[in-house]
From Swiss-Prot:
Pyrin domain boundaries: 1-94
GO biological process, one term: negative regulation of non-canonical NF-kappaB signal transduction
SMART domains associated with the record: PYRIN
Keywords from the named record: Cytoplasm, Immunity, Inflammatory response, Innate immunity, Nucleus, Signal transduction inhibitor
Gene Ontology CC annotation, any one: nucleoplasm
Domain of life: Eukaryota
Record-linked Gene3D superfamilies: Death Domain, Fas (1.10.533.10)
Expressed in which tissues: Predominantly expressed in peripheral blood. Weakly expressed in testis.
Protein name per UniProt: Pyrin domain-containing protein 2
Description of how the protein assembles with itself and partners: Interacts with PYCARD/ASC (via pyrin domain). Interacts with NLRP2 (via pyrin domain).
Keyword DNA-binding assigned: no
Length: 97
């Protein structure tokens, strides 16, 4: 896992660039992708109430960091947020340790 010193940004920073509506859409879409089964044990209300930082914590506590990055890339692409999916893909987005 990359440290924050090695990356100019992390998944939390990317999620914080989303508007409240976009973040809600991200939360909804994350469960629809094939990798979304990793989150099935997390109560929907917990995901719905989470802000960007809390969502990253949920991802990393219920799955591996590779999954979190891949899931984020897929959801950003579904949302037509290609600038975010490209940055995530290019830098292997992970939260700081």
């Amino acid at each position: 896992m990359a440290s924050s010193a090695e990356l100019d940004f992390n998944l939390q920073a990317l999620l914080e660039q989303l508007s409240q509506d976009e973040l809600s859409k991200f939360k909804s879409l994350i469960r629809t992708i094939s990798l979304g089964k990793e989150l099935q044990t997390v109560p929907q209300t917990e995901v719905d109430k989470a802000n960007g930082k809390q969502l990253v914590e949920i991802f990393t506590s219920h799955s591996c960091s590779y999954w979190a990055g891949m899931a984020a890339i897929q959801v950003f692409e579904k949302m037509n947020q290609t600038h975010l999916s490209g940055r995530a893909d290019e830098h292997c987005v992970m939260p700081p340790p």
